[in-house]
Amino acid sequence: MAIHINIIGAGNMAYQLTQAFHNHPEVQLQQLYNRSELSPEFNVFEIEKIHHLSTLRPADVCIIAVKDEAIAEISKKLPFENQLVVHTSGNTSIEAIDSKNRRGVFYPLQTMNKQTLVDFTKVPFCLEAENTNDFHLLQRLASLLSTKIYALNSYQRRVLHLAAVFINNFSNHLVYISEQICKENEVPFEILQPLLTETFTKLQNTSAYDAQTGPARRNDSLTIGNHLAMLDNNNYKEIYEIITNSIINTYGRKEL
């Protein structure tokens, strides 16, 4: 029997989940809600699209895929009770959902946008529910997309989200800084692409502690000093110093 779901939201998460579920033979995607008009990317989905929460019908799972700060308000306005309502946030407690409904979390841990389709077979799903039957339903729903399924409570999920920010968001910003340094000095950034690939490929099989290399790992003060002298951007210089000192401290050396 198909799992009937509704999706609330029109951002990257809502788009990717809609894309994954809308033609799945074991899922009936009933309704897609957003307060305002949906972006053109959603036009390809032959689903009932609504703009008033009062017209949202009950479903086996109602997925709230919106910004963290909007979860509580939307959950209070849902026009039904005692239904399974979940959010998709890594950083928000299950208790953000109004208690008039059965609460849960359906969190796929992956960076998302509307330009690149997510291969959910490679994505871990972190699940939480207040009762066993609801957890099993979320487990079944997640298993339609992935075999990587984890039961995490709200605190564990927030810890995971924090760690993910370091891996994904901060590392991406460091790559951006590298791009800017190359651009400002007319050096082709493409030269660094193989290094970028190797850095993250190596971490699939080696701990970050063991994989660390570079001047800070060697405590090469001459190279570090030369790099700092080359950085005219004070923000970049501060980031370089903070990360360098963190690496030095990690391996038991004295700070700069």
Predicted regions and their residues:
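NAD(P)+-binding Rossmann beta1-loop-alpha1 motif at the extreme N-terminus of oxidoreductases
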Residues: M1-L53
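Short, well-ordered alpha-helices that flank and scaffold nucleotide-derived cofactor binding pockets
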Residues: Y15, Q19-N23, K76, A229, ...
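Internal alpha-helical scaffold of NAD(P)-dependent oxidoreductase catalytic cores
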Residues: L17, P40, R102, L117-V159, ...
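Rossmann-like NAD(P)(H) cofactor-binding subdomain of soluble oxidoreductases
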Residues: L17, R35-L117
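Interdomain hinge/lid region at the active-site interface
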Residues: T199-L256
